[in-house]
A protein has these predicted regions:
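A short acidic, Gly/Pro-enriched loop at the edge of an enzyme's catalytic core
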Residues: 113-122
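N-terminal, positively charged/glycine-rich alpha-helical extensions of SAM-dependent methyltransferases
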Residues: 1-25
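A short SAM/SAH-binding and catalytic strip from SAM-dependent methyltransferases
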Residues: 121-133
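Conserved alpha-helix/loop element of class I SAM-dependent methyltransferases that forms part
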Residues: 34-52
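Short, glycine-/aromatic-enriched active-site segment of Class I SAM-dependent methyltransferases
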Residues: 152-172
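Class I SAM-dependent methyltransferase SAM/SAH-binding core
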Residues: 57-59, 63-111
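Conserved Class I S-adenosyl-L-methionine
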Residues: 195-257
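A short glycine-rich, Lys/Arg-flanked "PGG" loop and its adjoining helix->strand segment in the class I
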Residues: 135-150
């Protein structure tokens, strides 16, 4: 997994094919490797109520483009954490990092060492999956929140293509039963969940169509590994949703003041 992301972040910044893909699918090229379009990012801002005076940490920030966009939208100071050195290096070259509005650090979601009461808002945009122990990770994220702090998670849960249909636990699909919901509950955290599955389905269809249109460009740039990864994601999500075995949610913890 780490090898893939090292290769991914070394190539996509300069890829015209991937930039076009992100623009057509997500509404803007933020070098997305995930499932969040501008609409979902807007909902994340709205539900967490990020203010210009606040400090936010983005867990799994990649090369920082999404953190930069969210900081531009809200005026807040963002710290991005990622475990890929190449991604962090590129993030530190962003204009916001140079003027002090953005900071980026290397870190592992399974070995978090964050300051207690260090942030007003914690964001996880399709990154909690990398945790090997959701309850422990949530506990550490909760500890880094200041009084009145909030957390926002864009999160998908469903059958992966390699899991037989009859072996996937359907009972974990409702919003109060997903692994993330169980981890939040185990930590005594109240939350709300917004169902984004219909949006996820439409975006998966768009991804497949756009990738088909751009296949030649990905091949010319010799980054078919990115094309194949994105196509596999889209196909897997479409199949799982059509089987009734996939959900996408926005989980919000705490209330903006």
């Amino acid at each position: 997994m780490k090898d893939f992301y090292e290769k991914y972040y070394a190539r996509v910044d300069s890829s015209k094919a991937h930039a076009t893909f992100c623009e057509k699918v997500f509404g803007m090229n933020l070098c997305q490797h995930g499932f969040a379009d501008l609409h979902q990012l807007g909902l994340l801002i709205e539900t967490t109520g990020i203010k210009a005076t606040e400090k936010v940490i983005d867990i799994g920030s990649g090369n920082g483009r999404i953190a930069e966009y969210l900081s531009d939208r809200t005026g807040a100071h963002f710290t991005g954490l990622d475990f890929i050195p190449e991604a962090v290096m590129k993030a530190r070259q962003l204009p916001g990092a140079k003027n002090g509005r953005l900071a980026f650090i290397e870190g592992d979601i399974n070995a978090l060492d964050l300051p207690r009461n260090g942030y007003d808002v914690v964001l996880s945009i399709d990154s909690i999956y990398f945790s090997s122990d959701y309850p422990t990770t949530i506990s550490k994220l909760d500890e880094t929140l200041r009084p009145g702090g909030r957390m926002g998670f864009l999160y998908s849960h469903g059958r992966e293509p390699w899991v037989p249909k009859d072996q996937f636990p359907k009972e974990t699909l409702p919003p109060d039963s997903t692994p993330l919901a169980q981890a939040l509950t185990a930590n005594g955290l109240a939350y709300t969940a917004m169902d984004l599955t219909d949006r996820d389905y439409e975006l998966a269809k768009i991804r497949k169509r756009v990738l088909t249109e751009l296949e030649g460009q990905f091949a010319e740039e010799d980054i078919m590994f990115v094309y194949e990864n994105r196509l596999g994601e889209a196909s897997g999500i479409l199949n799982a949703i059509e089987e009734g075995l996939h959900r996408r949610y926005l989980y919000s913890v705490g209330r903006p003041g």
